[in-house]
Amino acid sequence: MAQPASPRGVGLVGPSTLLIRFLSFCITENHPDVMTNPLPDALLSYARRTVVVTGAATGMGAETVALLLETGAEVHALDIAEVTTPVTSAQHVDLGDPASIDGVLDDLPPRIDALMHCAGIPGGTRFDPRTVVRVNFLGLRHLTEAVFDRMGDDASITSIASLAGGGWPGHRTEIFELLATDDFVAGDAWLDGRDDLVGDGYSFSKECVQFWTMWRSTSAIRSGVRVNAICPGVTDTKIMVDFRQAMGDAAIDMTADAGIGRLASPTEMAPAMLFLGHHQAASYINGVNLDIDGGFMAALTTGQVDFSKYNLGS
């Protein structure tokens, strides 16, 4: 089967792929015996792997799709926006509507090697809190359970959570209750009367994604499916304006400055999605929420953030 054309050029030529090639060269140059080990090939290829990606049209999802195509994957894209990348199939879906999700199931492949949840919407003024939770968590869960039987040994589910979801320990009991609901509709009904818990929807929805990742990983691995998530820090996507409105410039700037000193790029998130989703490179990684924040949480945890530099009340 001919490989799809890469949006970054022809074949395996993207910057992330070149980095992986270089690392593999260094490994084999210094340790020739590793040539008998499958790891170098594992780092280079998604060939013959079928991957479903939500939120594939823009931002981190689009970068994930681009890198998957560079590494040989068969990509099936889902998004409410038009997907222009040359994927195997692209379906319009609203993850905030279970009927919309159910409507595309017949168009998805019978076997799915990796499911990558990249769709998400911000809190703030553009979306009401219930819609945010529906899209960011309830839809994610609904799609996962709807296609789970199509996944088997060596399959993976990888989601984009957020550093903003790190408050889940304070809401463990409530999140357990939400996870106990049977389906999308029951989960949505559970939100009734819990406006204080839900807030603007974003942090709570990402708390749910983080906790669900750990919770679902234990049962999923019995079927050979690993479940992980990445937790990006402040990332320069088109919804950054929403985060600045919701959190304030000072909080965004502090999160960026305390680590590497700049916002992340969506291109810096895609390689982590591919790594965690890979059946060989990450074969023993399960139930992990991986912070990708330029070192912000390390600085915060060790008391190295100078809060006095920022007017966090503004």
Question: Which residue stretches match the model-derived regions?
Answer:
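Flexible N-terminal pre-Rossmann segment of NAD(P)-dependent oxidoreductases
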Residues: L23, I27-T50
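Canonical Rossmann dinucleotide-binding motif of NAD(H)/NADP(H)-dependent dehydrogenases/reductases
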Residues: P40-V75
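Catalytic loop of short-chain dehydrogenase/reductase
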Residues: I121-T125, D153-R222, V234
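Short, flexible catalytic-loop segment of classical short-chain dehydrogenase/reductase
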Residues: C231-D242, A298
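Rossmann-fold cofactor-recognition segment
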Residues: P86-A99
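Short, small/polar-rich loop/turn modules that mediate ligand/substrate recognition or access, typified
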Residues: R226, I285-G287
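A conserved structural motif in NAD(P)-dependent oxidoreductases
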Residues: A258-M269
